């Protein structure tokens, strides 16, 4: 199989050079007199090979000998990386040993030792390996002339056939809606300002961007609207002069004689502004992401006639962004039905398709294989054109893109260009994604962690951390349509997946259902689909794979179901794979691992043990000094971490969600590389105190701090230094009910100490989300009311049962969500909820000016919600959703004016007084209203008081007597679509349904005093009405059943 190698290998070689020129490695070579030339030999061989890599990439496509040379080079580079990694790992081990030494004198002595000192004992073996690697590289370098490889300074793109504006519309299916959507922007109903705007069509290679632009270009409305149309196929070469010249020749209808760009652009500008007619320029297949080039090209068009447009097709979202497109149309794959029509047209032309059952079944599977890609449909259909042999159809079905006949397929060249022009650092990342099975949806963060483990993220000239670089790389691939976002995850189109496999070659292997595991001695990356039980024989082939780096079981579903892994695999086979960098045993029913399981896997950077049944981790885990990622989420039996986990000084990501841990081991603060720590458990006496967080300066994302009742020393809390952790965005503070009397003590001294501790846990002002759960103090910290927390968007207060008042949160400028629940001591909400003591003097600021969701839940003693007047604006001016749930003692009314409220839910608030008459105008935008087991004073409900009400639910309102249409309002409830009434035992009056909207859904159940069933009102049966059904049950005349009636009738009319 042909592979793609040059820039892929260039990224490897760049990383190798960085290691070789680093001071520790140069010191190592200088200290060994017999090997002082080894470094120079190795560097020279690498430089010689690098010079011919560009030529090698081109020639390996058609020359099997060059392909073999490239694959041999990749294998040697992997071995070189392994050797250098051995040196770095040994240095790490000795450094950690020095730091852990109990002897200060020994620690100081070792601290002064060089890497060469560390390696004296093992240097002979390591130097022998490097010598072998150097010899292999020198041999490959010497073969460059024999293979005819030349030194090239730049990649020469292979010219593809240019596109034209012509299209055969009989061969286009399923693009009418796309065409209509883009036409709205090309020819808008309303006029536009002078100048030119850009519309972009973005999509994966082969999805039909050019075809769609051809349809638009040749549309009759487009021809009549635009005075001049120009089609320019740009491809990889963005030549401003050539494009400008072509536009000029199209506008003037004569050859261009100008050779100076400035003169040409001036002349073109004069012609465009002089005609007064809009023009259309199509730039097909645009790749250039240089804003300066685009800015130069657009200069003559800036003052073009009103309505002028540039239509761009590109695979890159970034191109569309750079060109400031007013509309970006993300072109989606065709439906299976449209693909079938195109396939039949391609295979049989204008003849009637003639398919027997066997070929018909194969045809459906081939069409499905194309996954909506028109180019793939036409390519596979073209290979089978008028082909009647079943064996040929089966061959095409099972073929991969590189297996198709070169003279009949342009699918691979079209897709390959997406890879060809990737930067070097992205090629390795993209090729690695070949380990994902077709159809597998993957998480962005996990892929970044895998790339990081494999060493693909290079910080050469960047101040960004590895995770930020990985996210940047991922976004680049997504922008280029190589990765596609679903609702929550990402996928690769099947043919892009094959392209990645094509790029990765024999170094990557997938073990999928129904396939035999195919690996070679060169295989470095392996994934397979988990099954209920993995047979040992399925993994026998791995005994020959001595240099495997990735062992990754996957699932095509998001199921959390656990599987079984044979003990032979987990305890005998895996420990022999000493070069592993990625190891996952996630979702396996593993209760224990041998004590020395990780002893020989010291190179691993990524370890996923999530959703296993492990009760404790082997101590040998603490010798994995290179480990960067440790996933232990939902290990529901795991009760403790190894004592010496602090040795993992390179650990960056530790996920402890869903474990049974109750404390962290001692010296946890030594893990200074941590970027993500999901949970920190404050220890009681023999573990890590909260002060251990103080040294973890680089924590990002979300942190949950649990067992805060164990913090009794205010100084400890201050040393946690939460206010210095500027990268944290979410913090959950959680107290628990402790088992000891001291932890349960709620005397005034104890609660005062809790408040003082919490005051010292002030987070950085960049925090965005806060949750406080089971806090045992009597007052919230002052910092919680500080308006300098300008980024907080969400606060959750749960079961803070000793607090009798809420913190002053009204002046947090960006707060959008506030959830308050389980505060049994809260009785009143008043002015201090909106303003702090200092802010009470100045009430000009609108309280809660950004709040959109407010939820009160399970506040059993809450009695009053005092209304507050402000000198400017309204309370809650942005509030959209209000929930008041399980507040049985709450009396009085709701805030009088909530102009933005669209959803109101009241549940089990019997004493709350809600009268629609009082809120008709103040809640004018209300769309959803739900009142359940609440508002005992509610007797009548005028349906037409809320003009925008879409959904009304009333359940167990004991006093409700009537739903009516108020006579003072001529309008009806025209927006109402769903009316649900249940168990309102005193309800007796309903409005005539012919006065309600025709498409209203009405459900009425268990309302026993509705005295007249709806079907007995014939005066409202008008033929022009056709309303959906109304369900009434539980009334005396419905015999207790749930019956359906035509809703053109009415219950007892008023």
UniProtKB/Swiss-Prot annotation:
<dbReference type="Pfam" id="PF25019">
    <property type="entry name" value="LRR_R13L1-DRL21"/>
</dbReference>
<protein>
    <recommendedName>
        <fullName>Putative disease resistance RPP13-like protein 1</fullName>
    </recommendedName>
</protein>
<comment type="function">
    <text>Potential disease resistance protein.</text>
</comment>
<dbReference type="InterPro" id="IPR027417">
    <property type="entry name" value="P-loop_NTPase"/>
</dbReference>
<dbReference type="Pfam" id="PF23559">
    <property type="entry name" value="WH_DRP"/>
</dbReference>
<keyword id="KW-0611">Plant defense</keyword>
<feature type="repeat" description="LRR 4">
    <location>
        <begin position="650"/>
        <end position="672"/>
    </location>
</feature>
<feature type="region of interest" description="Leucine-zipper 1">
    <location>
        <begin position="9"/>
        <end position="20"/>
    </location>
</feature>
<keyword id="KW-0175">Coiled coil</keyword>
<feature type="repeat" description="LRR 5">
    <location>
        <begin position="676"/>
        <end position="697"/>
    </location>
</feature>
<dbReference type="GO" id="GO:0005524">
    <property type="term" value="F:ATP binding"/>
</dbReference>
<feature type="compositionally biased region" description="Basic and acidic residues">
    <location>
        <begin position="1043"/>
        <end position="1054"/>
    </location>
</feature>
<keyword id="KW-0067">ATP-binding</keyword>
<dbReference type="GO" id="GO:0043531">
    <property type="term" value="F:ADP binding"/>
</dbReference>
<dbReference type="InterPro" id="IPR041118">
    <property type="entry name" value="Rx_N"/>
</dbReference>
<dbReference type="InterPro" id="IPR056789">
    <property type="entry name" value="LRR_R13L1-DRL21"/>
</dbReference>
<feature type="domain" description="NB-ARC">
    <location>
        <begin position="152"/>
        <end position="462"/>
    </location>
</feature>
<feature type="repeat" description="LRR 1">
    <location>
        <begin position="579"/>
        <end position="600"/>
    </location>
</feature>
<comment type="similarity">
    <text>Belongs to the disease resistance NB-LRR family. RPP13 subfamily.</text>
</comment>
<dbReference type="InterPro" id="IPR042197">
    <property type="entry name" value="Apaf_helical"/>
</dbReference>
<dbReference type="InterPro" id="IPR036388">
    <property type="entry name" value="WH-like_DNA-bd_sf"/>
</dbReference>
<dbReference type="Pfam" id="PF18052">
    <property type="entry name" value="Rx_N"/>
</dbReference>
<dbReference type="InterPro" id="IPR001611">
    <property type="entry name" value="Leu-rich_rpt"/>
</dbReference>
<feature type="region of interest" description="Disordered">
    <location>
        <begin position="1018"/>
        <end position="1054"/>
    </location>
</feature>
<feature type="repeat" description="LRR 3">
    <location>
        <begin position="626"/>
        <end position="648"/>
    </location>
</feature>
<dbReference type="InterPro" id="IPR032675">
    <property type="entry name" value="LRR_dom_sf"/>
</dbReference>
<feature type="binding site">
    <location>
        <begin position="203"/>
        <end position="210"/>
    </location>
    <ligand>
        <name>ATP</name>
    </ligand>
</feature>
<keyword id="KW-0433">Leucine-rich repeat</keyword>
<dbReference type="GO" id="GO:0098542">
    <property type="term" value="P:defense response to other organism"/>
</dbReference>
<dbReference type="InterPro" id="IPR002182">
    <property type="entry name" value="NB-ARC"/>
</dbReference>
<dbReference type="InterPro" id="IPR003591">
    <property type="entry name" value="Leu-rich_rpt_typical-subtyp"/>
</dbReference>
<feature type="coiled-coil region">
    <location>
        <begin position="117"/>
        <end position="147"/>
    </location>
</feature>
<dbReference type="Pfam" id="PF00931">
    <property type="entry name" value="NB-ARC"/>
</dbReference>
<keyword id="KW-0677">Repeat</keyword>
<dbReference type="Pfam" id="PF13855">
    <property type="entry name" value="LRR_8"/>
</dbReference>
<feature type="region of interest" description="Leucine-zipper 2">
    <location>
        <begin position="39"/>
        <end position="53"/>
    </location>
</feature>
<feature type="repeat" description="LRR 2">
    <location>
        <begin position="603"/>
        <end position="624"/>
    </location>
</feature>
<keyword id="KW-0547">Nucleotide-binding</keyword>
């Amino acid at each position: 199989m042909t592979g793609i190698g040059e820039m892929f290998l260039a990224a490897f070689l760049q990383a190798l050079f960085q290691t070789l020129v680093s001071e520790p490695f140069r010191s190592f070579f200088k200290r060994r007199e017999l090997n002082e030339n080894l470094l120079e030999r190795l560097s020279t061989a690498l430089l010689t090979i690098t010079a011919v890599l560009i030529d090698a990439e081109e020639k390996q496509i058609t020359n099997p000998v060059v392909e073999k040379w490239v694959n041999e080079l990749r294998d040697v580079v992997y071995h070189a990386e392994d050797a250098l990694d051995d040196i770095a790992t040994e240095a790490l081990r000795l450094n950690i040993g020095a730091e852990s030494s109990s002897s200060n004198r020994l620690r100081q002595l070792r601290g002064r030792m060089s890497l060469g000192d560390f390696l004296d004992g093992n240097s002979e073996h390591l130097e022998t390996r490097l010598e072998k690697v150097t010899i292999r590289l020198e041999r490959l370098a010497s073969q460059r002339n024999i293979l005819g490889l030349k030194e090239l300074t730049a990649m020469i793109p292979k010219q593809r056939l240019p596109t034209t504006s012509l299209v055969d519309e009989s061969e286009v299916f399923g693009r009418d809606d796309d065409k209509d959507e883009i036409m709205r922007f090309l020819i808008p109903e309303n006029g536009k300002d002078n100048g030119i705007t850009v519309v972009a069509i973005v999509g994966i290679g082969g999805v039909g961007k050019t075809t769609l632009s051809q349809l638009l270009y040749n549309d009759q409305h487009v021809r009549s609207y635009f005075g001049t149309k120009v089609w320019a196929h740009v491809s990889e070469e963005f030549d401003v002069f050539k494009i400008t010249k072509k536009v000029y020749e199209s506008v003037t209808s004569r050859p261009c004689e100008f050779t100076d760009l400035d003169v040409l652009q001036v002349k073109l500008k004069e012609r465009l502004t002089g005609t007064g007619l809009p023009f259309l320029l199509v730039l097909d297949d645009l790749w250039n992401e240089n804003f300066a080039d685009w800015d130069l090209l657009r200069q003559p068009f800036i003052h073009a006639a009103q309505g002028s447009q540039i239509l761009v097709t590109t695979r890159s979202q970034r191109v569309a962004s750079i060109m400031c497109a007013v509309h970006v149309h993300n072109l989606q794959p065709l439906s299976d039905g449209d693909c079938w029509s195109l396939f039949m047209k391609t295979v049989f032309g204008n003849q009637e398709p003639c398919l027997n059952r066997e070929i018909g079944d194969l045809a459906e599977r081939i069409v499905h294989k194309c996954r909506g890609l028109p180019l793939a449909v036409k390519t596979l259909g073209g290979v089978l054109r008028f082909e009647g042999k079943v064996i040929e159809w089966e061959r095409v079905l099972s073929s991969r893109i590189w297996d198709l006949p070169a003279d009949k397929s342009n699918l691979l060249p079209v897709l390959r260009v997406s890879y060809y022009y990737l930067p070097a650092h992205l090629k390795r990342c993209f090729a690695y994604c070949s380990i994902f099975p077709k159809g597998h949806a993957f998480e962005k963060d996990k892929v970044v962690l895998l790339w990081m483990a494999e060493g693909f993220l290079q910080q050469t000239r960047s101040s960004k951390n590895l995770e930020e670089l990985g996210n940047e790389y991922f976004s680049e691939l997504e922008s280029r349509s190589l990765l596609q976002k679903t609702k929550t995850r990402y996928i690769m189109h099947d043919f892009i997946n094959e392209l990645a496999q094509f790029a990765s070659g024999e170094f990557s292997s997938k073990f999928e259902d129904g396939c035999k595991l195919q690996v070679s001695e060169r295989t470095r990356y392996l994934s397979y689909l988990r099954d209920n039980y993995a047979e040992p024989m399925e993994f026998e082939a791995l005994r020959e794979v001595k240099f495997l780096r990735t062992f990754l079981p996957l699932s095509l579903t998001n199921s959390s179901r656990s599987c079984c892994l044979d003990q032979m695999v987990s305890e005998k086979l895996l420990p022999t794979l000493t070069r592993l960098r990625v190891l996952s045993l996630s979702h396996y029913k593993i209760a224990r691992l041998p004590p020395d399981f990780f002893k020989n896997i010291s190179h691993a950077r990524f370890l996923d043990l999530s959703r296993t049944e492990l009760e404790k981790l082997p101590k040998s885990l603490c010798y994995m000094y290179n480990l960067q990622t440790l996933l232990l989420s939902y290990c529901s039996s795991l009760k403790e971490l190894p004592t010496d986990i602090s040795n993992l000084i390179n650990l960056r990501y530790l996920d402890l969600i869903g474990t049974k841990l109750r404390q962290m081991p001692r010296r946890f603060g030594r893990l200074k590389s941590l970027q993500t720590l999901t949970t920190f458990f404050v220890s009681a006496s023999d573990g890590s105190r909260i002060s251990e967080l103080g040294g973890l300066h680089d924590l990002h994302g979300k942190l949950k701090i649990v067992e805060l009742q164990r913090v009794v020393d205010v100084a400890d809390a201050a040393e946690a230094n939460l206010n210095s952790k500027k990268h944290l965005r979410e913090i959950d503070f959680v107290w628990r009910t402790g088992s000891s009397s001291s932890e349960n003590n709620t005397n005034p001294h104890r609660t005062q100490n809790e408040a003082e501790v919490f005051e010292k846990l002030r987070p950085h002002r960049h925090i965005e989300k806060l949750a406080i759960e089971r806090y045992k103090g009597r007052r919230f910290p002052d910092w919680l009311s500080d308006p300098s927390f300008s980024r907080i968007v969400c606060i959750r207060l749960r079961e803070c049962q000793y607090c009798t008042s809420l913190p002053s949160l009204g002046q947090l400028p960006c707060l959008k969500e506030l959830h308050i629940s389980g505060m049994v001591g809260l009785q009143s909400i008043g002015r201090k909820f909106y303003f702090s003591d200092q802010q009470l003097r100045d009430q000009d600021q609108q309280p809660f000016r950004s709040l959109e969701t407010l939820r009160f839940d399970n506040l059993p003693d809450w009695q009053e919600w005092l209304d507050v007047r402000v000198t400017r604006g309204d309370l809650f001016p942005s509030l959209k959703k209000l929930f008041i749930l399980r507040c049985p003692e709450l009396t009085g009314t709701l805030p009088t004016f909530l102009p933005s409220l669209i959803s109101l839910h009241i549940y089990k608030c019997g004493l709350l007084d809600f009268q629609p008459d009082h809120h008709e105008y103040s809640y004018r935008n209300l769309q959803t209203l739900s009142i359940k087991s609440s508002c005992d004073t509610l007797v009548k409900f005028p349906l037409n008081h809320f003009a925008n009400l879409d959904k009304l639910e009333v359940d167990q309102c004991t006093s409700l007597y009537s739903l009516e249409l108020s006579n003072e309002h001529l309008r009806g409830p025209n927006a109402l679509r769903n009316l649900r009434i249940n168990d309102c035992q005193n309800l007796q009056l309903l409005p005539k349904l012919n006065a309600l909207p025709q498409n209203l859904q009405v459900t009425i159940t268990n309302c026993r005093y509705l005295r007249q069933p709806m079907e007995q009102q014939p005066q409202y049966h008008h033929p022009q009405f056709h309303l959906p059904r109304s369900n009434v049950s539980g009334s005396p005349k419905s015999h207790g059943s749930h019956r359906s009636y035509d809703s053109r009738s009415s219950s007892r009319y008023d």
